[in-house]
Amino acid sequence: MKNSITTWKWSLGVMARSPAVLVVLAAVAALWGFGAYQWLWLPESSGLLLLLALIWAIAQFAVAIAFFAAISTASVGTATSDGRRIEFRSLLGFSRAQYWRALAWGAISMVVLLVLFYFFKWTDDHALEVASLLTFRSEKAVSPIRVGKVFWVIQMIIWIGGGGFLLSFLAHLLREGWTETRRQAARILRRCCWGASFWSGLLSVGVFGSLAWLLATWHPKVTVGSWDYTQMLLRMGAALVLVVSGWLFWSLSLARSIFQPDKPPTA
């Protein structure tokens, strides 16, 4: 636990010394979200527009993968060099071959996340049946709401563990390639299911994610007018910065716990 706290302090220190990087990453994420929002409103009135929507979706996916690869590369580079801040050039430190690996990782991750999403949706739909079965077996009333909360806790644990595994896998993949990463996949999974990697993800989601959710859902009472839109933009912007900060903190903590700083050569 002591090593985990040291890692978290280092990650927070790096982020505190890199405010410009955080703002740039948040701005890129905002532009990506704006593009995705515009894509959702594309009409489906012709085959040409459907083709445009397909190309647009592929471009959005490619940009998202570049975003994830940039954060992972910068995090690993900062961790291995024992850096005190994230340099802008490290965000573009991945090669074309590494980007193709990241694209393959993104496609596999999308399939895994979709399978988990629909599986959890199926379990949520059967919460009432589970509550009825438990009521029948225990002869005591079991609320489906309570069953749903238990399902939610289990799902969050799986989401955090799975997210840590995917981020760690990406970091290994970009640095070491497919062969070495596949060889270490079981060890990566064990580390992310329990240990420093899991707690880093829990801290990231619990602190940064909760603060972002509170800001995004907070509705202060203001007079209708320009200030109403201003406070909304400020809240959403701050929430987005917190989301990006949480992702960066998670990535930095994983990189620091996985890769040791490179030792300088001895004479």
Label for each model-derived stretch:
Residues 1-267:
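Hydrophobic alpha-helical membrane segments
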